[in-house]
Amino acid sequence: MNRESETAKHVNLGTRDSSTNTIRDLSRVLVVGKSPINRVVVSKIVERSGLRPISEPPDIAAKTLRTLVPGAIVLDGGPDNKDCDNLMPGIEMLRRTSGKSLPPVILLSTKNGTPESLGLAKVVDVVVAKPITPERLQPVIDRLINR
């Protein structure tokens, strides 16, 4: 199976600024977190929704977001909800540029709360409390992707 031809079915080229071409692929979900185990668990849940996960640590994910606009982003906040803080400005810029708060962003948090209560209303659409289970996360992914 040729991955390039498969991706081409879902890819749209866009421009973020005059010097950067970005690829929009709504079938992909960027899964970001420092814990490789949590990234694998979340990626399997994403696959159950019929989507293709891209699993990366925060430093690599920042580079990926410069060239790819995924259908959604899932951030694992880690033990203190700060693991992905360096990505927030880039995600906020993507969402402002889209004009529609896209891509949707899910934060996996150790605390219960709303994006507003955590001070992330401009960047995060939904907060899902840990532990991560398919019963909690999959309906949220499905709802955000289909909005």
Where are these regions (language model features)?
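Non-catalytic signal-transmission and effector/linker regions of two-component phosphorelay proteins
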Residues: 1-39, 43-45, 94, 98-102, ...
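Short acidic, S/G/P-rich loop/turn micro-motifs used as interaction or catalytic elements
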Residues: 35-38, 76-83, 112-114, 134
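Acidic, metal-coordinating helix/loop segments flanking the phosphotransfer/catalytic sites
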Residues: 56-72, 76
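Short acidic active-site motifs
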Residues: 59-64, 83, 115-116
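Conserved phosphotransfer microenvironments
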Residues: 74-101
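Alpha4 helix (beta4-alpha4-beta5 surface) of REC/receiver domains from two-component response regulators
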Residues: 85-86, 110-127, 139
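A short, hydrophobic beta-strand element within the central beta-sheet of small alpha/beta folds
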Residues: 98-113
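A Lys-centered signature of the CheY-like receiver
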Residues: 130
